[in-house]
Amino acid sequence: MYTGRFAPSPTGLLHIGSLLTAAASYADARSNGGKWLVRMEDLDPPREMPGAASHILHTLEAFGFEWDGEVAYQSRRYALYEETLCRLQTAGLVYPCHCSRKDWQAAAVHGADGFVYNGRCRNPQQRPALQGKQPAWRIRVPDRDIGFSDGIVGGYAQNLARDIGDFVLLRADGYWAYQLAVVADDAEQGVTHIVRGQDLLVSTPRQIYLQQCLGVPTPQYAHLPLLTNAQGQKWSKQTLAPALDLNRREQLLRQVFRYLKLPEAPETDRPAELLDWAVAHWDMGKVPKHAITTP
């Protein structure tokens, strides 16, 4: 059975880009007779906005979204992440990293998603002294391409050794890394289809590699076009994207429907009816591949 999900982070309030992702993932799930889960990715407390999680859920309800089951909170799932890391440790696929960023980034090269880790701590003889600090944990990556066929973008691949380097699963400050948490959650929740923004396309080969290491199924992925401002920057909390206006729900839904190339919806003042209409007319094949500039 199709199981999709929407996984916002409570570092801020939902904005127009969030609404596009929620609407597309919802329409794809419901049009396939599937479940649609909501998961709160609250992994980084220092960056979270007080009250954002409850505001996000209230906003989704106000826009007519209905999710299946209880909302999952990553902050309550640490035991799952510990078990997942333990499996990788037992298999000898991970190692403790004692490097500070200063230790390795000075001589590092830029890759697909920031600096490429140089593998210094792969060799126990080269690991710097801990000096009472907890290490991070990294996973060894292969020197080969890991690719997949995306439902919107098409074929995409990375050589993890060249483009990413051994990546962190547990940070030295004790916080779980996004890549491990999302793979563990998707597997445990039985997620089969992931519809999300293209800013996460670069993360997908890492997640597929982790799925392979853990022996869990790889979902089908579809990465949506990003909404950008006049300067070409992705609308986000960092670029001061305005929060969704609950007094303009129908107008905003129609706006994201146009971005997703849905036909013009009939007149109604009920957001839930607009979502039902989007489900009935959903066509992933018409979704644009490239970024969309918005007012």
Swiss-Prot record:
Protein name as annotated: Glutamyl-Q tRNA(Asp) synthetase
Native species: Neisseria meningitidis serogroup C / serotype 2a (strain ATCC 700532 / DSM 15464 / FAM18)
Cofactor needs: Zn(2+)
Gene (name only): gluQ
Alphabetical UniProt keywords: Aminoacyl-tRNA synthetase, ATP-binding, Ligase, Metal-binding, Nucleotide-binding, Zinc
UniProt GO MF annotations: ATP binding; glutamate-tRNA ligase activity; zinc ion binding
InterPro entries xrefs: Glu-Q_tRNA(Asp)_Synthase, Glu/Gln-tRNA-synth, Glu/Gln-tRNA-synth_Ib_cat-dom, GluQ/Sye, Rossmann-like_a/b/a_fold
Positions of L-glutamate binding: 5-9, 41, 178, 196
Motif ('HIGH' region): 8-18
Residues reported in the UniProt entry to bind Zn(2+): 97, 99, 117, 121
Function of the molecule: Catalyzes the tRNA-independent activation of glutamate in presence of ATP and the subsequent transfer of glutamate onto a tRNA(Asp). Glutamate is transferred on the 2-amino-5-(4,5-dihydroxy-2-cyclopenten-1-yl) moiety of the queuosine in the wobble position of the QUC anticodon.
Keyword flag Aminoacyl-tRNA synthetase: yes
Keyword Metal-binding attributed: yes
EC number(s) recorded for this UniProt protein: 6.1.1.-
Top EC class for this record: ligase
Gene Ontology cellular component list: cytosol
Family: Belongs to the class-I aminoacyl-tRNA synthetase family. GluQ subfamily.
